[in-house]
């Protein structure tokens, strides 16, 4: 998690500085109220009206790991059940965002996932509200390749959830089996 410069990548409402603490809350799965809050904070900040942000593909990696952990303890932990239900819906939304635009003309994604956090694409090290506002208002804030990469790599993370979806489809729980089968966008 420390390899991602969270404080230097954009979200819907600013920077992703607080994401590591939210991921820890979700990973620990100890308090349902805290888990719900953390999930909302992250998901509301990585997708807004079908727009994905710089933080989205990176957050998706950690949400996928949390999802996998939650699936492994489903029906044993109230938080795990909630996380699986919530993230199934959210992952489908992310897949829809990608697929809705993928048939249109678009640039090539950056060659490597890690290219998205090259220095030239990051916000300044120090937070400056005025500087960030100017950054957001600039229509050339993100190169076309970087911007498309937010969608492309986020979808790749969702696609990597296939084994967990199969596990849910084959579960003894009819609820989880049906829910996973409804996830049709992969």
Where are these regions (language model features)?
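Acidic, serine/threonine- and proline-enriched intrinsically disordered linkers and terminal tails
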Residues: 88-165
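Residue-level signature of the C-terminal ends
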Residues: 45-49, 66, 70, 93-101, ...
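Core helices of alpha-solenoid repeat scaffolds
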Residues: 15-20, 55-60, 154-162
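HEAT/HEAT-like alpha-solenoid repeats
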Residues: 20-32, 61-73, 166, 170
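Eukaryotic acidic, Ser/Thr-rich intrinsically disordered low-complexity regions
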Residues: 2, 148, 162-186
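Residue-level detector of extended alpha-helical repeat arrays and alpha-solenoid scaffolds
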Residues: 35, 56, 77-80, 84, ...
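HEAT-repeat alpha-solenoid elements in large eukaryotic scaffold proteins
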Residues: 32-45, 88-91
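N-terminal "cap/leader" segments of large eukaryotic alpha-helical scaffolds
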Residues: 1-37
């Amino acid at each position: 998690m420390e390899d991602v410069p969270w404080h230097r990548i954009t979200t819907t409402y600013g920077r992703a500085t607080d994401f590591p603490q939210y991921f820890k809350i979700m990973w620990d799965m100890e308090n349902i109220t805290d888990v719900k809050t953390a999930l909302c904070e992250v998901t509301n900040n990585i997708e807004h009206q079908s727009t994905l942000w710089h933080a989205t593909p990176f957050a998706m990696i950690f949400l996928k790991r949390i999802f996998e952990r939650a699936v492994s303890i489903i029906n044993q932990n109230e938080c795990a059940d909630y996380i699986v239900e919530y993230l199934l819906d959210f992952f489908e939304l992310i897949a829809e965002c990608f697929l809705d635009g993928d048939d249109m003309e678009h640039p090539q994604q950056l060659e490597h996932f890690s290219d998205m956090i090259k220095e030239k694409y990051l916000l300044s090290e120090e937070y400056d509200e005025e500087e960030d506002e100017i950054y957001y208002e600039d229509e050339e804030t993100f190169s076309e390749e970087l911007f498309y990469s937010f969608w492309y790599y986020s979808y790749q993370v969702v696609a990597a959830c296939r084994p967990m979806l199969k596990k849910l489809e084959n579960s003894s729980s009819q609820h989880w089996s049906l829910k996973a089968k409804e996830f049709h966008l992969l």
